[in-house]
């Protein structure tokens, strides 16, 4: 039986711009909003859009990501006719090859895709924060009789040179693609979300491999090839909240935006939930000295200090006399007595010793996974 659409989430990037936060884990596994990991948004969008088969393409530091995804049950993707498959580089008869780019990762997994037998493939990035109904995008793809549909977001003209820009005609058919142009002709930025007719994409990737034509990345190679070949390529305009959290500053900004009860992600919308794999934790404990204001505090936290406009992830501790302002404290991190944290991201399991001050007023500060700042005590 032919499946309608298979989603492939590209989650193998190293995320070097996130510095210490991705030294031990893949970028899509980085925590967000206290309760989630970044990849939860793409997985939840798939589940909410009625996509039952998902492949997650991994490469760099995949252990935490693989453990988080498991069998897909947290997203309802563990049924008889559904599932999540973790796709990692492997040694084949022609030799061992790491994924060389986004489209090369798809080529290396042709056998898996053929086993699902989809009519369409949906290509997603695993490191963006947003909500999207992919079924609406698929309907647009069908209505336009497109070979390829690219999701685009209207961005300010002054920022357009940071993105791949799609120039379209009056019917939203893409006539030109410009990769990070110095003088952009439009403001329709690619979101890195694509729907392809699978057989057409398959034929192109196989032909390119046989002829040794470089076809490693969608933006650099595949989209220009489709346009040059006269394929019908259309833009799908998205107007909701979307955030590329590939830098420390953008990750911090997205978390701060998420604190607001009226945040653009509409996190309390029960019609489009964001699911995650959440371990059972005890209730929060607020001590006699605790003062919590305008913050998100997740299960299992211990607070006996002051927390303002911040996020405390599962099991985080803010001890007596400590102050946390405009910061993200990830799971299991400990803020010691009298410590002061301002505009910072404190990684999972990190320890900020008693009396330490971290001030990100000029630039958001980061403490890495399990990093110790100051002299840890036996109590830590």
UniProtKB/Swiss-Prot annotation:
Pathway: Glycan biosynthesis; glycogen biosynthesis. Keywords: ATP-binding, Carbohydrate metabolism, Glycogen biosynthesis, Glycogen metabolism, Nucleotide-binding, Nucleotidyltransferase, Transferase. GO terms for biological process: glycogen biosynthetic process. It holds the Pfam family NTP_transferase. Its EC number is 2.7.7.27. It comes from the Bacteria. CDD domains: ADP_Glucose_PP, LbH_G1P_AT_C. It catalyses: alpha-D-glucose 1-phosphate + ATP + H(+) = ADP-alpha-D-glucose + diphosphate. GO terms for molecular function: ATP binding; glucose-1-phosphate adenylyltransferase activity. It is an enzyme of class 2 (transferase). Alpha-D-glucose 1-phosphate binds at residues 164, 179-180, 190. Belongs to the bacterial/plant glucose-1-phosphate adenylyltransferase family. Homotetramer. Involved in the biosynthesis of ADP-glucose, a building block required for the elongation reactions to produce glycogen. Catalyzes the reaction between ATP and alpha-D-glucose 1-phosphate (G1P) to produce pyrophosphate and ADP-Glc. This is Glucose-1-phosphate adenylyltransferase. The gene is glgC.
């Amino acid at each position: 039986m032919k499946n309608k659409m298979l989603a492939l989430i590209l989650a193998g990037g190293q995320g070097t711009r996130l510095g210490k936060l991705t030294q031990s884990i893949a970028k899509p596994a980085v925590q967000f909003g206290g309760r989630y990991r970044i990849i939860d948004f793409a997985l939840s969008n798939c589940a909410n859009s009625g996509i039952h088969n998902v492949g997650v393409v991994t490469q760099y530091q995949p252990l935490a990501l693989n453990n988080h995804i498991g069998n897909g049950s947290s997203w309802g993707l563990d049924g008889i006719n559904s599932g999540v498959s973790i796709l990692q580089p492997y040694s084949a008869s022609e030799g061992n090859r790491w994924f060389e780019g986004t489209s090369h990762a798809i080529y290396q997994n042709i056998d898996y895709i053929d086993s699902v037998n989809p009519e369409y493939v949906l290509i997603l990035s695993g490191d963006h924060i947003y909500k999207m109904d992919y079924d609406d995008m698929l309907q647009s793809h069908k209505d336009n009789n497109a070979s390829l549909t690219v999701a685009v977001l209207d961005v300010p003209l002054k920022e357009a040179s940071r993105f791949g820009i799609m120039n379209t005609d009056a019917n939203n058919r893409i006539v030109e693609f410009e990769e990070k142009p110095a003088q952009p002709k439009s403001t329709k930025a690619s979101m890195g979300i694509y729907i392809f007719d699978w057989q057409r994409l398959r034929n192109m990737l196989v032909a390119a491999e046989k002829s040794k034509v470089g076809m490693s990345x969608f933006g650099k190679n595949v989209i220009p090839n489709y346009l040059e070949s006269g394929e019908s390529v259309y833009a799908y305009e998205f107007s909701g909240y979307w955030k590329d959290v590939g830098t420390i500053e953008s990750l911090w900004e997205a978390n701060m935006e998420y604190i607001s009860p009226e945040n653009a992600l509409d996190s309390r919308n029960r019609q489009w939930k964001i699911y995650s794999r959440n371990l059972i934790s005890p209730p929060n404990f607020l001590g006699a000295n605790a003062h919590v204001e305008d913050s998100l505090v997740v299960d299992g936290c211990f607070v006996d200090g002051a927390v303002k406009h911040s996020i405390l992830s599962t099991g985080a501790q803010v001890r007596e006399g400590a102050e946390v302002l405009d910061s993200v404290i990830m799971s299991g991190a400990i803020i010691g007595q009298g410590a002061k944290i301002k505009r910072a991201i404190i990684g999972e399991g990190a320890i900020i010793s008693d009396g330490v001050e971290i001030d990100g007023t000029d630039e958001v500060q980061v403490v890495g996974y399990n990093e110790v700042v100051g002299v840890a005590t036996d109590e830590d």
